[in-house]
Amino acid sequence: MSISSDTSGSVPGSPIDLEPESETICHWQSCEQDLLTLDNLVHHIHNGTTSNLRLISNINSILDHIGNRRPKYTCEWDDCPRKGMVQTSRFALVAHLRSHTGEKPFICSVPECDRSFTRSDALAKHMRTVHEADTLRPSDPIPKAHPMHPQNVANAMVQSAREARAQQQMHGVGNTNEDVENWLDAASMPKTSHDMYRLQKRKLQWVKEERTMLANHLEALERKLIDARNRKEKILNEIVKQVDPSISR
């Protein structure tokens, strides 16, 4: 997905209220280089170059745009009402320039949604209003008490799988992991990529639980093996002493 996909929301300090169309020409101090794509333009502005140097006709015009570790950062975009005004930081200047370029780096994480935004708060508003994530910001973890918390979803799936496996045992049906895997596939029937993602997370939780159970079983067997070896050594020592008391192991 391109970073120039549709969006809503604007950048504080934007020269216009409407969201700009994606730009490909650099208007920083009359640079006027056409970078052909928004990705190339953003790379050009941020790094003073482009990922495709063959696009550049005047190498001197691409140097020292935003720069790094400068004492002050100002927008030098032609026709910008805030041109020459000092920004609070390089980060603030980068955010401001999105109003000129149309860059939208904040992408909705819902698989079936293709929206992207210039600002993180615009993405948060989209998540609340469109995807009904009322109590969560995009960066917030899902509360453990929430029914959609991965652990709760996984636990419910594991419990259902255990019940199905118990039914299989009662009827003399094999209870291999493959049986449970097939049951999970048949029960879930994912219809969207988001459903598939959730299913795979549930399967991952199932695998982790099985791994923990097997690790505990292995640890118990290793303890039994050590005890058996110790008993063997003790018995062997007793036998050797009886055969030849002068021999000490």
From Swiss-Prot:
Q: Name one Pfam family in it.
A: zf-C2H2_15
UniProt record, GO biological process: CENP-A containing chromatin assembly; DNA repair; DNA repair-dependent chromatin remodeling; regulation of transcription by RNA polymerase II; transcription initiation-coupled chromatin remodeling
Q: Where in the cell is it found?
A: Nucleus; Cytoplasm
Query: Any idea which UniProt keywords this protein has?
Result: Chromatin regulator, Cytoplasm, DNA damage, DNA repair, DNA-binding, Metal-binding, Nucleus, Repeat, Transcription, Transcription regulation, Zinc, Zinc-finger
Zinc finger region(s), C2H2-type = 73-100, 106-131
One Gene Ontology cellular component term attached to this UniProt record is: chromatin
Any idea which GO molecular function terms this record carries? RNA polymerase II transcription regulatory region sequence-specific DNA binding; zinc ion binding
Source domain of life is Eukaryota
Q: Subunit structure, per the record?
A: Component of the INO80 chromatin remodeling complex.
Describe the task this protein carries out: Component of the INO80 complex which remodels chromatin by shifting nucleosomes and is involved in DNA repair.
Q: Which PANTHER family match?
A: TRANSCRIPTIONAL ACTIVATOR CUBITUS INTERRUPTUS
| Name by which UniProt lists this protein | INO80 complex subunit 1
